[in-house]
Amino acid sequence: MKTQGAHVSTDPRAAIAAADTALGIEFGSTRIKAVLIGPDHEVLATGGHGWENHLEGGLWSYTLDEVVAGLQSAYASLVADVRERYDVTPVSYGSIGISAMMHGYLAFDADDNLLAPFRTWRNTNTGRAADELTRLFGFNIPLRWSIAHLHQAVLDSEEHEPRVARPTAPAGRGPHPA
């Protein structure tokens, strides 16, 4: 808040109790980060969860269960930080923002069932597809883009490919368990 050019700080504990805060969650490739921002745009608390993709069937992946567990862990560590700093537990937020990796491949059917393990940005098996798409569009298509993964699945006649109704990356999915 500003009053006649002077900066007036808001009490963090009161802001948290009044839900005058913003919660941010970011799903990065090696860490899930959580941050609580106050009305003065100051960081009030943070939390996080380290994770690492793993080889599954020759491809780098995370499971959706790992996504949910990582979110829960990052959020729990944020809440613990809030409690330790301010002796209050947040129960509501003024706003929530979620950011996730924009690269990789999640393939869902018409009923929103995951058809193949998530393929992370780290996979480089999409060279042929990326080259073909780059030539077709006259625009560089990186190996890690979802469209390169989808086209590679078509080129490889992967079992799941005919049932893909919605290909996306983590940024297009969000961690909403069924």
Locate each region found by the language model.
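N-terminal glycine/serine-rich phosphate-binding loop of ATP-dependent small-molecule kinases
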Residues: 1-116
